[in-house]
Curated annotation (Swiss-Prot):
The organism's place on the tree of life at top rank: Eukaryota
Segments traversing the membrane: 20-40, 66-86, 101-121, 130-150, 191-211, 224-244
Protein name in UniProt: TLC domain-containing protein 4
Gene name as annotated: Tlcd4
Protein family (similarity comment): Belongs to the TLCD4 family.
Residue ranges constituting the TLC domain according to the UniProt record: 57-259
Amino acid sequence: MEASTKAAVGSGAMEASTKAVICTVCSSFVVFQILFHFVSYWFSARVSSGYNSLSIDKKIEWNSRVVSTCHSLLVGIFGLYLFFFDEATITDPLWGDPTYVNINIATASGYLISDLLIILFNWKVIGDKFFIIHHCAGLTAYYFVLTTGALAYIANFRLLAELSSPFVNQRWFFEALKYPKFSKANVINGILMTVVFFIVRIISIPPMYFFLYSVYGTEPYIRFGFVIQSVWIVTCVILDVMNIMWMIKITKGCIKVISLIRQEKAKDSLQNGKLD
């Protein structure tokens, strides 16, 4: 009797958790769609005087990046809190209670589905095969996290990469508004973008694979089964290869801007010297 009661309670809790996840994913999807189609138009026109002068294509990308920034700040900050204070997943990174992390993962999943639709419906404007690969890899991993309760800590750790997106998007906003490349705001944002991207997307790579190596073959790892083990490794490799490619591109751009600034300063010094 007691065993059957516990089983019933466990089943009920799991069903409630599943409903909560589905509701969060759907709510997230709807909210980010509303942000893209309505809120960003209204908000951007009031915050930036240059928004109304942009072409329709530019406005579409602008709005998608506003949504991206909102998502990144939301899941990034919440993810950072969970990374330091969610005792359940910190204590057991492989099978710890994913209740709070699931909220973050479900929110991110709703955004990824929303953004995939936006990209597909506006392919000629913002279509990018790398974003499709990135989103599909993320959704695949999140599906298994949300349905099995495994690897919640790792999934949340990967979400911290979103903390770099606001700086990447801000660079695009400056470019769309035709801010001078050497303006103080542009240069500071560029440096911050490079540093933050490196910290949350590149420095985090070695610890991730060291942890994978340390748990490989253990009983909790074996419990995953072949499918989850494969998804963990394959999706991480795909995302990390893309992050390294983007990091190289960002670093080259940052070095180029810094070298041009030095050249401009050297010219100014030379001109001042001649004038003196």
